[in-house]
A protein has these predicted regions:
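ER/Golgi luminal nucleotide-sugar-dependent glycosyltransferases, focusing on the catalytic module
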Residues: 1-274
Length: 274
């Protein structure tokens, strides 16, 4: 197995390390050395939850999103140490999972001999790999221009800017990248979580897909938590607890939005009847 380092970026508006994040870190620690950095004021007690799964866990409010947390970790670890690894993973906690064997995905992508890869690809604004999970091989890790990209990163209010430029930046340097799941329809792939799992054993579900289903989910929402658990084997309590902590979920497989819509329709119908 290749020696991997994983830079895990975190954020929680209540400065809590959620259970689903602990599970994510635990699974990532099986395939890599995990370093965690959160944007916020996390207490040491919260960060200590990660002590069994990470080499380092810290937090600081920097307001530069995931790339800011990854930059902080790179500054802490140093390129000399990072270059000792065969692969560098960047990952954030905007995903539930994993729901499938990550080593199988690494084996599959290793056969294709890419210099960098992600799980999904995106055509918004320009073609790029989604940065919630990306992998960089040794030649990129050692490249001075890659170091400059991270070292020279500046604060920005555009949370997508660095994600959208990273893929073309590496391509212009002569590196070859691709996605594990191809997006031939140029659609929002992550809006179809169960389809992606069935067809590609997609290991993750985007948090915002379930957090804001009215805008981000294009599959039936009723009992989505139970269906996820039954079809993927992932403990849906991680999802329920997280969304409940956000005030967006009320059990029985109905999101806040779906339940709100249901009662709105019910009240409207009652008005008509009376």
């Amino acid at each position: 197995m290749n020696k991997r380092i994983c830079l895990l970026a975190g954020y929680d508006k209540k400065n809590v390390v959620q259970d689903y994040v602990l599970y994510l870190a635990r699974k990532l620690s099986k395939i890599s050395d995990v370093y965690y950095f959160a944007d916020g004021h996390f207490t040491q007690k919260e960060l200590n939850k990660l002590r069994h799964y990470t080499k380092y866990a810290a937090s600081c409010p920097h307001k530069t999103y995931d790339f800011g947390s990854w930059q902080c970790l790179i500054c802490h670890i140093g390129w000399e140490k990072i270059m000792m690894y065969d692969e560098m993973i960047i990952c954030n906690d905007s995903i539930y999972g994993p729901m499938s064997n990550m080593e199988d995905i690494f084996d599959y992508m290793d056969l294709r001999d890419y210099d960098f890869w992600g799980l999904t690809e995106n055509y918004n604004s320009n073609y790029h790999l989604d940065s919630y999970f990306m992998v960089f091989k040794k030649d990129i890790i050692k490249h001075p221009k890659f170091h400059e990209f991270w070292n020279n990163m500046m604060p920005t209010s555009n949370r997508r800017i660095y994600e959208s430029v990273l893929t073309p930046f590496l391509t212009e340097l002569g590196f070859t990248g691709n996605s594990y799941i191809k997006n031939y329809k140029k659609e929002d792939q992550l809006a179809y979580p169960l389809r992606l799992f069935k067809t590609n054993r997609m290991p993750f579900i985007r948090v915002n897909t379930l957090k804001y289903p009215a805008h981000n989910l294009k599959e039936p929402i009723l009992y989505i938590d139970t269906r996820i658990e039954n079809e993927t084997g992932y403990d849906a309590d991680f999802i329920r607890k997280h969304l409940e902590s956000e005030g967006l979920f009320e059990g029985f497989g109905l999101s806040y939005y779906a339940k709100k819509s249901f009662y709105a329709i019910k009240n409207k119908f009652s008005d008509w009847v009376h």
